[in-house]
């Protein structure tokens, strides 16, 4: 069978794309030519339709090989959940299986519908619309993946997050091993540890409690988990420490910092390593291996 064609693709819904003399068509699972090789390009079938290219324009055929939707689009994707993304005049929108324009072509990019939502791109940012074309989740992410079981992965400022269909962040409470929803009013959120989670707003980090209340203002350039009652934070490229009240217990003045263990932490400054206590004082060890505060 393959010897009769220049190319044979994978089977999708009982048909495989084949190429003969620079034209594309389809065979069935018996190897029979089901749809003539007459298209300039062709994609696999999905939900009973396949994208085909004719004279530089995309349209759709059905499994009988009939031209179900005219070749008039500049770009086109598979049908999924009854909608297909199509491109006209440099913008993407969606049509239904009747070929009707269901959602206006106004997006810079558009993905398939999954679980009633599709990721769309506008002004270099990704968000989500529903099947009515309503903006369900604002375009504010650098990248967005499809929803699966009500959750989707998104990226913003080189950080990866999980959101639900309301656009709220879903994070793990590591102490209780349960998931908690955090308001989409924040730009990002981390997992809970010791009752606090780092949240991002306007490129600054702060903390909320498990009730979702802002307990420490978003004013740090970076913020780590709380560990043994203290969190490492960054201001102006320098590391320091805060307590659970948000008080700056150790000034942000170090080039690097580790978590406190039994009241002591390793820090780095000017390529030198030191040990400090929770007051920020340096600790040295004498010949008798006694720790002395300086």
Residue ranges and their predicted role:
Residues 1-294:
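Residue-level detector of conserved, function-critical positions
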């Amino acid at each position: 069978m393959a010897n009769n064609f220049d190319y044979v693709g994978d089977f999708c819904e009982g048909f495989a794309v084949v190429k003969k003399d620079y034209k594309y068509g389809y065979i069935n699972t018996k190897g029979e030519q089901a749809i003539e090789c007459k298209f300039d390009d062709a994609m696999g079938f999905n939900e009973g339709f396949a994208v085909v290219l004719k004279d530089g324009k995309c349209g759709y055929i059905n499994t009988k090989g009939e031209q179900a939707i005219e070749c008039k689009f500049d770009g086109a994707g598979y049908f999924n959940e009854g909608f297909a993304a199509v491109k006209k005049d440099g913008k993407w929108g969606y049509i239904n299986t009747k070929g009707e324009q269901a959602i206006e072509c106004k997006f810079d990019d558009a993905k398939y519908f999954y679980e009633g939502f599709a990721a769309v791109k506008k002004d270099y940012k990704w968000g989500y619309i529903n099947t009515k074309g309503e903006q369900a989740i604002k375009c504010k992410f650098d990248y967005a993946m499809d929803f699966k079981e009500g959750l989707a992965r998104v990226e913003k400022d080189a950080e990866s997050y999980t959101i639900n269909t309301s656009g709220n962040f879903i994070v793990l409470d590591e102490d209780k091993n349960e998931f908690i929803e955090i308001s989409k009013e924040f730009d990002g959120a981390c997992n809970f540890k010791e009752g606090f989670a780092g949240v991002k707003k306007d490129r600054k980090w702060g903390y909320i409690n498990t009730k979702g209340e802002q307990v420490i203002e978003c004013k740090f350039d970076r913020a780590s988990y709380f560990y043994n009652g203290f969190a490492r934070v960054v201001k102006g490229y320098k590391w320091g420490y805060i307590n659970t009240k948000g008080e700056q217990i150790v000034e942000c003045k170090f080039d690097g910092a580790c978590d406190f263990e039994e009241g002591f932490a390793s820090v780095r400054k000017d390529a030198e390593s030191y040990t400090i206590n929770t007051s920020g004082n340096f600790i040295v060890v004498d010949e008798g291996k006694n720790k002395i505060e300086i």
